[in-house]
A protein has these predicted regions:
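Rhodanese-like catalytic fold shared by cysteine-dependent sulfurtransferases
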Residues: 2-4, 15-34, 42-75, 84-124
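Hydrophobic helical h-region of N-terminal Sec-dependent signal peptides
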Residues: 8-9, 13
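Active-site flanking residues adjacent to catalytic metal/cofactor-binding acidic residues
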Residues: 37
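Metallo-beta-lactamase
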Residues: 78-80
Length: 124
């Protein structure tokens, strides 16, 4: 819950964090050397997800940090609906020692606007 509070209050923080274009993120989905992490909530995932992205809702991220790469230098891309939450989570993960975290500009709302393939999330 602490992580959620920190992220909520810093969600409008500076966007000076490392960011990546939607096109680049799309090209990296499925690349085994990059984790592309969709941090939207389950009700947002229900609208469609991109195949190959790991789904960890922001509300559960703190309890699921063990699912992130063990190497803190591994590349992690974060995507949410627009980029507000993903930029805040990137900042928080960097403060926890992850050195190669970027957020995706535009988010999944822009992904959908471009008509890129989305599918129903896997059943838990």
């Amino acid at each position: 819950m602490k992580l959620i509070s920190i992220i909520f209050f810093s969600s409008l923080a500076s966007f000076a964090h490392a960011q990546v274009s939607l096109d680049e993120a799309r090209s990296l989905v499925g690349n085994s050397s990059v984790m592309v992490l969709d941090i939207r909530e389950p009700e947002e995932h229900a609208t469609g997800v991109a195949k190959g992205m790991k789904l960890i809702p922001m509300s559960t991220l703190e309890s699921r940090l063990n699912e992130l790469p063990k190497n803190p230098n591994s590349r992690v891309l974060l995507i949410c609906n627009t980029q507000n939450r993903s930029s805040a989570v990137a900042k928080e993960l960097r403060s926890r020692g992850f050195t190669n975290v970027e957020y995706v500009r535009g988010g999944m709302s822009e992904w959908a606007k471009r008509g890129w393939t989305m599918e129903s999330p896997a059943k838990p």
